[in-house]
Amino acid sequence: MTHQFNPTILREYDIRGIVGDTLTEADAYALGRTYAALGRDEGARRIAVGRDGRTHSGMLESALVRGLTEGGIDAVLIGMGPSPMLYFATHYLDVDGGIQVTGSHNPADYNGFKLLLNGRSVFGAEIQAIGQRSSRGHWSEGNGATEEVDIREAYVNRLVEGFSGKPYRVGWDAGNGAAGPILDMLVDRLPGQHHVIFSEVDGTFPNHHPDPTVEKNLADLKELVEREQLDFGIAFDGDGDRVGAVDGKGRVIWGDQLLMILAAPVLDELPGATIIADVKASQTLFDRIAELGGRPLMWKTGHSLIKSKMKETGAPLAGEMSGHIFFKHRWYGFDDALYAAVRLIEAVSQSGGSLTGIMDSMPKTTATPEMRFEVDEVRKFAIVEEVRDRLSGDGAKVDATDGVRVSTGDGWWLLRASNTQDVLVARAEAADQSGLDRLVAQIDDQLAKSGVKRVEATH
């Protein structure tokens, strides 16, 4: 038996599509069969399976598990929860890998799968290989068993293990995502006062879209912090692997700023350690890590790529602008928004001040948000290469780690191709608005030379 996946769902970091359109129940079954065959090739026998709270996650999970067991893999079902709980399961349980059914932070009609096998994320070429193997029908046969295991208590216990934070007044917004029930358990274990909103799981996301990196999605949290006069607020995305925050004045604390705060206590304990951030992060972050005695490392955007670089370098902490925060220090190295929140409370406690005070003391720069604009899929990487070649010929200071990051006397700008969508991504940062306008004009000038006009993408 063979199965053809819609090629658009085989993404760089996971499998994701629109349910009933590009992603079907048959795809979930075929993924289970193909993953079982790949896993058995590597000696895998037991796989943990979790799901988020989307309306179709249960249906996809059932088909996936049927495929796994018919392929000879035992499935250990941990039920509904955030993606990091599934990642935790791969360390806590006697299993050889894991699959989370999740649409991440995509709109409600999307869903997909995040895959782990033998201690690694399955991404890039390995995801393409799943499609190729499925189309050839190279499936294993067997009769695997299913088992249900409740690890929620163990997961929450591990989240607060060794916690040394002070009692703060904190607002929390779970965005009706899969982290909600775990959050309700977590705040009962933390000192202080906790005001939780939208912890009821609802896959239609009735209150706001669960993406805390978009400021409008933090409006309810800001209002809660202001109304209750809280110290700060914390928000999660739909599957609980990305974190957002606001201070006591309602100011958004972006991913690179969070990493700046979280790095200080880690470097106190591990002087000289490497701290990784993606190419979209502020230069002030890399400068601050160096000031604290750490080794800043700029790396490619993408949570699977960051995890791989952490393993390679032994870095205890990494983060992305998108709110993925990865702790290897006292944790497992995977991105977990709930754990990042716990460590944020600790970091503020250890600073001796308030999160608002920390924000007040941060270097003041002016930056664009992440600018995304649609381009022809076949041209997106070529455009970046053209820009790189022109700038290198002009003697500009260019970092080509991931796209083009150009350093100037008073700032920097970035242009890179998205690995997951037909868009180019740009960002710029300068000392003041006039400098920022000049850098954005440089981006537009380079795009124009490659025949592209910057029009904001709708996705």
PLM regions: where:
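Glycine-rich phosphate-binding loop
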Residues: 96-110, 225-247, 252, 296-298, ...
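Short glycine-rich phosphate-binding loop at a beta-alpha junction
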Residues: 44-52, 169-171, 273-279, 316
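N-terminal small/polar loop signature for handling phosphorylated ligands or for N-terminal nucleophile
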Residues: 37, 41, 45-110, 157, ...
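Phosphate-binding and adjacent anionic-ligand microenvironments
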Residues: 270-459
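Gly/Ser/Thr-enriched, mixed-charge loops and adjacent short helices
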Residues: 109-228
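An N-terminal, well-structured beta->alpha segment
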Residues: 1-66, 70-71, 148-168
